[in-house]
Curated annotation (Swiss-Prot):
Statement: the UniProt record of this protein carries the keyword ATP-binding: no
Region Disordered, residue ranges: 1-21, 94-128
Compositionally skewed regions (Acidic residues) per UniProt: 95-106
Gene for this chain: Tmem183
Name of the protein in question: Transmembrane protein 183
Signal peptide stretch: none
Chief subcellular location: membrane
Taxonomic classification: Eukaryota, Metazoa, Chordata, Craniata, Vertebrata
């Protein structure tokens, strides 16, 4: 009995203490050497082997410290000083510590980026730039495409002034001129020596010689897909008609209405057009500025009332009664129509053209726009 009671009451000295289930193992920084790094420490390892699926930050910092020490770098330059300050001391690798480190790094990156931005803003507090001479802009203008002239002139005042000079437009004309170009008499090289209307003549010639501009006007259909709305409140300056004899047995009639669009400065009193320098006024003179031509071709002659000097207020294109052609209706008033004002059917002078073969709208730079040789 004594033997049995003694064995039951005494402690078991040779009992081995087992680790608790689920407890993480301790990580020692000196264990993370090049000889003990396994494939399981990297992101491409099997997730079944490594639960996290990525390299622990302390492992990466330890390897980084070892590499830098081998390269002769001081330990103070290693980013993870605090985690590896005591070599040989245990440090627990917890997910929460990784998240806190990531937050600290993101905070430091944001502070550094803010400092860089503040330095950039402090470099030029007045916002003043460097002004280049006019000759530099004139040299750069020699490499500008015709469709980029507007963007080039908006760079600065000197760039805009260059586009006002006669030298700029003369060089632009010579750059795109070819001997086989079919040009009207006013747009030929011997007539381009005149400074008056030089800019307008060069722009007109580009629609004959410059392929991108010529391709734009060649795509215009005989009947526009939508009714043009740019002619509203335009003034009719001139009207004429002529007989067209073609392949058809019966001739067609062409009715032309020359309009002058409303000037932008009339729409808003605060808006004023930028005027070129006085010495270049002749270069920018254009009698047909803001003008366009409405050309309507009909299958027979139609009587047209006098509409010159009146304001064009309504333009509609519908299907004709025979369902094979189109019908054009024009309405003219004595005064412009304000926004939102409705017109009655009996108001104004109405012009009805039916049946219509074609409807075309030409701006002043179009090759088919009639302009005076004295321009």
């Amino acid at each position: 009995m004594a033997r049995g009671s003694g064995q039951l009451g005494g402690p078991h000295r040779d009992t081995v203490t087992m680790p608790k289930r689920g407890k993480r193992l301790k990580f020692r920084a000196h264990d993370a050497c090049s000889g003990r790094v396994t494939v399981a420490d990297y992101a491409n390892s099997d997730p079944a082997v490594v639960r996290s699926g990525r390299v622990k930050k302390a492992v990466a910092n330890a390897i980084q410290q070892e590499v830098k020490s081998l390269c002769g770098l001081e330990a103070s330059q290693v980013p993870a000083e605090e985690a590896l300050s005591g070599v040989g001391e245990p440090c627990d690798i917890l997910d929460s510590s990784d998240e806190m480190d990531a937050q600290e790094e993101s905070t430091q990156e944001r502070s550094v980026s803010r400092k860089k931005k503040s330095k950039r803003h402090k470099e030029d507090p007045d916002g003043t730039g460097e002004e280049y001479p006019m000759d530099i802009w004139l040299l750069l203008a020699s490499y500008i495409r015709p469709e980029d002239i507007v963007n080039f002139s908006l760079i600065c005042k000197n760039a805009w002034t260059v586009t006002c000079t006669a030298a700029f437009w003369t060089r632009l004309y010579r750059r795109h001129y070819t001997l086989d170009a079919s040009l009207p008499l006013r747009l030929r090289p011997e007539s381009m020596e005149k400074l008056r209307c030089l800019r307008a003549c060069v722009i007109r010639s580009l629609y004959h010689m410059y392929e991108p501009f010529a391709a734009r006007i060649s795509k215009n259909p005989a009947i526009p897909e939508s009714t043009p709305s740019t002619l509203k409140n335009s003034k009719c300056l001139l009207f004429w008609c002529r007989k067209i004899v073609g392949n058809r047995q019966e001739p067609m009639w062409e009715f032309n209405f020359k309009f002058k669009k409303q000037s932008p400065r009339l729409k808003s009193k605060c808006m004023e057009r930028l005027q070129p320098p006085i010495q270049y006024q002749d270069v920018h003179t254009n009698p047909d500025q803001d003008c366009c031509l409405l050309q309507v071709t009909t299958l027979n002659f139609i009587f047209i009332p006098i509409v010159m000097g009146m304001i064009f207020t309504l333009f509609t294109i519908n299907v004709s009664t025979d369902m094979r052609h189109h019908r054009v209706r024009l309405v003219f008033q004595d005064s412009p129509v304000r926004g939102g004002q409705n017109l009655r059917s009996e108001q104004g002078v109405q012009v009805v053209l039916d049946p219509v073969h074609s409807v075309r709208l030409f701006d002043w730079w179009h090759p088919q726009y009639p302009f005076s040789l004295r321009a």
